[in-house]
Structures are given as structure tokens and as C-alpha cells.
Regions:
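Charge-dense, helix-prone N-terminal extensions
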Residues: 1-109
Length: 109
């Protein structure tokens, strides 16, 4: 697993400090899920969000952005398929979201 950032290098621990406490457990679970999808995962910690890519080709498949009480998620399965955008407030549809993220990881080239 590689960690990459453009511009000022930002670590997840620094980023975690800006995530509202109410959102942290859900964000952490989604982050861990993405990191465990494969050895070729690249985590790009940006100013307000984290983007997960498949290998150094930077084919991103998931974008997680915390808000005050939710997580904005963008999922990309292919450059030819429109991006799916979701807002998650609780664990209610977590398994469904994980399935979509895994499908995106599997299908992105």
C-alpha cells in the first residue's frame, strides 16, 4: 500500500483531526475497507477529502469527504460510466456501499 499526496504532503492522522467526532467511526470503517481491497491501493490524502486509487496509474475508484454529520462518497467504476455520488449519515446502507466500492475497485482499469 502506498501513500501519495500532491502539493503539501498530508498524512491521514493530520486529516483525521478535522473529521467531526460523530463521523469518525463511519469514516474510519470505510477507509479501512478501501485500504484492504488490495495491495495496490494508493491513498491520496487531500485538503478536505481522501481519494483511493488503484495502483500508481491513479485510476481512482472512491472519494470520501467528511461533512459535519455525514460522508460524501463518490464512486467511479469506469471513465465511461457516470460517477455515483452518495451521502451517508449512518451505518444503515453500509454493506450496500461497500459492495459498490468493491465493484468499482474490481472494474476500474
Amino acid at each position: 500500500m502506498d501513500f501519495v499526496s500532491f502539493g503539501n504532503k498530508k498524512e491521514f492522522n493530520d486529516f483525521k483531526n478535522q473529521i467531526p467526532i460523530i463521523v469518525q467511526p463511519l469514516f474510519e470503517e470505510l477507509r479501512q475497507f478501501c485500504l484492504e481491497l488490495g495491495e495496490n491501493i494508493v491513498e491520496d490524502v487531500r485538503m478536505h477529502r481522501i481519494v483511493f486509487c488503484k495502483s500508481m496509474t491513479f485510476r481512482w475508484f472512491t472519494d470520501l469527504e467528511p461533512t459535519q454529520n455525514s460522508i460524501l462518497i463518490k464512486i467511479q467504476k469506469s471513465r465511461k460510466i457516470p460517477i455515483t455520488s452518495l451521502e451517508v449519515f449512518s451505518y444503515d446502507k453500509l454493506e450496500e456501499i461497500k459492495t459498490s466500492i468493491k465493484d468499482a475497485y474490481t472494474s476500474i482499469h
